[in-house]
Amino acid sequence: GKCGEINGSCDECYGGSVTCDCY
């Protein structure tokens, strides 16, 4: 899943230089 996707996973949001909100 990508950042901001309600049904997405937070794997792409945490770990790395990217900060974003996962729902």
From Swiss-Prot:
GO terms for cellular component: extracellular region; host cell postsynaptic membrane. One of its GO terms (molecular function) is sodium channel regulator activity. It is found in: Secreted. The keyword Nucleotide-binding does not apply. Keywords: Disulfide bond, Ion channel impairing toxin, Ionotropic glutamate receptor inhibitor, Knottin, Neurotoxin, Postsynaptic neurotoxin, Secreted, Toxin, Voltage-gated sodium channel impairing toxin. Insecticidal neurotoxin that reversibly inhibits the N-methyl-D-aspartate (NMDA)-subtype of ionotropic glutamate receptor (GRIN) and inhibits inactivation of insect sodium channels (Nav). In vivo, is highly toxic to insects. This is U1-ctenitoxin-Co1a.
